[in-house]
Amino acid sequence: MTRSAKKGPFCDASLVKKVEVAQANKDKKPIKTWSRRSTILPDFIGLTIAVHNGRQHVPVYVSENMVGHKLGEFALTRTFKGHAADKKVTKK
């Protein structure tokens, strides 16, 4: 189920504060956050946010298409290395 429209988007207060400071100072360095659950707001456009994926912070550059999505969608937590190759290949 989606979030109720009357509630509005969720965004951590600490992240909003960091974004406001970065925009006021015209700071371009990434903003570190562990808040994967926060919704990307229009204020975030043009900023780089380093989102924690459980192991490291993945830099995510926010564009217009990302508004309304969650930060965690852009920092993958699982790495797929591929299935093991079948070594019993027989030629006929």
Curated annotation (Swiss-Prot):
Q: Does the keyword Phosphoprotein apply?
A: no
**InterPro entries named in the record:** Ribosomal_uS19, Ribosomal_uS19_bac-type, Ribosomal_uS19_CS, Ribosomal_uS19_SF
GO cellular component terms, semicolon-separated? cytoplasm; small ribosomal subunit
Query: Might you name a Gene Ontology BP term for this protein?
Result: translation
Entry keywords, A to Z: Ribonucleoprotein, Ribosomal protein, RNA-binding, rRNA-binding
Pfam families, alphabetically?
A: Ribosomal_S19
One GO MF term on file is: rRNA binding
Which domain of life does the UniProt lineage start with?
Bacteria
Q: Which family does it belong to?
A: Belongs to the universal ribosomal protein uS19 family.
Instruction: Summarize the protein's role.
Output: Protein S19 forms a complex with S13 that binds strongly to the 16S ribosomal RNA.
Q: Which HAMAP family match?
A: Ribosomal_uS19
What is the name listed in the Swiss-Prot or TrEMBL entry for this protein?
Answer: Small ribosomal subunit protein uS19
Organism of origin: Polynucleobacter asymbioticus (strain DSM 18221 / CIP 109841 / QLW-P1DMWA-1)
